[in-house]
């Protein structure tokens, strides 16, 4: 790979977008995560801030949005853990990062669609301490088996187009959960936690995603069915804009990131 932090920040600035970085809670360490934050946002005479300067960036990147791991609720992830373990670790990581840079916005990982109770465990641990600004949700909808790509199967077509409604129900459930927990701790000046939809899209892959492109290529197939499904979800985001204040589509493609080596 020839595309690292410096190149990503440069790309974001060129595209006039705000970077959103994810700390590696699966196989990484708290020290590595803190070093990354120091590299990006540090202003003092410290090792990683000076390393950024050495790389030609005198001013800090001022990366605002950070997430505590990725899909730690999924057994497919390296570092998968139970809700209580994730919440406990996220608490300590968030405390550390807030002390390093109080200006950042931190997102914790929820529980996908399968485990609504996991959201409760994480939020009850982190909201009373005002450690997070967002709870992250990921949603994909579509045919789970090899699809008829031209959309001739009417049942499959309507299934894909209608499935975002499940995501809207999840938004409302999580938003209600946040409100109830904040009300429970109304004696504390807790942060107004919002929802960050950090991955969303129609899920239609020719053979499903493999563990590595050399084993099974990552080949999304998008047609009118998927376009309508995404259009439905864009309307859902509009309807729930008070609860969902950050959303990023997946999977984006950056061919320039990969190199022949």
Which sequence ranges carry the predicted segments?
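A structural motif corresponding to the C-terminal end of an alpha-helix
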Residues: 4-18, 96-103, 173-192, 233-244
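Hydrophobic alpha-helical scaffolding
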Residues: 26, 83, 109, 157-167, ...
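Low-complexity, polar-biased intrinsically disordered regions enriched in Pro/Ser/Thr/Gly
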Residues: 47-52, 184-187, 209-217
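Generic, ordered loop/turn and secondary-structure boundary motif
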Residues: 62, 73, 161, 258-259
């Amino acid at each position: 790979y020839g595309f690292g932090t410096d190149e990503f920040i440069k790309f974001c600035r060129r595209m006039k977008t705000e970077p959103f970085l994810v700390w590696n809670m699966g196989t990484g360490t708290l020290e590595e995560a803190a070093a990354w934050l120091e590299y990006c946002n540090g202003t003092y005479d410290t090792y990683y801030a000076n390393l950024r300067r050495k790389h030609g960036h005198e001013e800090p990147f001022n990366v605002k949005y950070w997430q505590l791991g990725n899909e730690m609720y999924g057994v497919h992830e390296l570092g998968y853990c139970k809700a209580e373990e994730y919440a406990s670790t996220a608490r300590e990581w968030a405390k550390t990062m807030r002390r390093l840079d109080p200006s950042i916005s931190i997102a914790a990982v929820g529980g996908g669609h399968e485990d609504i109770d996991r959201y409760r465990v994480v939020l009850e641990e982190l909201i009373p301490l005002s450690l997070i600004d967002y709870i992250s949700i990921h949603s994909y909808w579509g045919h789970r088996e090899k699809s008829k790509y031209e959309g001739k199967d009417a049942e499959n077509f309507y299934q894909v187009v209608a499935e975002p409604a499940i995501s809207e129900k999840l938004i409302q459930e999580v938003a209600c959960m946040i409100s109830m927990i904040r009300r429970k701790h109304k004696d504390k000046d807790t942060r107004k936690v919002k929802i960050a939809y950090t991955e969303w899209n129609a899920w239609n892959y020719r053979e499903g995603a493999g563990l590595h492109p050399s084993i099974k290529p990552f080949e999304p197939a998008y047609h009118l069915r998927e376009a309508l499904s995404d259009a439905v979800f864009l309307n859902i985001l509009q309807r729930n804009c008070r609860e969902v204040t950050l959303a990023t589509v997946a999977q984006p493609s950056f061919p320039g990131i990969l190199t022949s080596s």
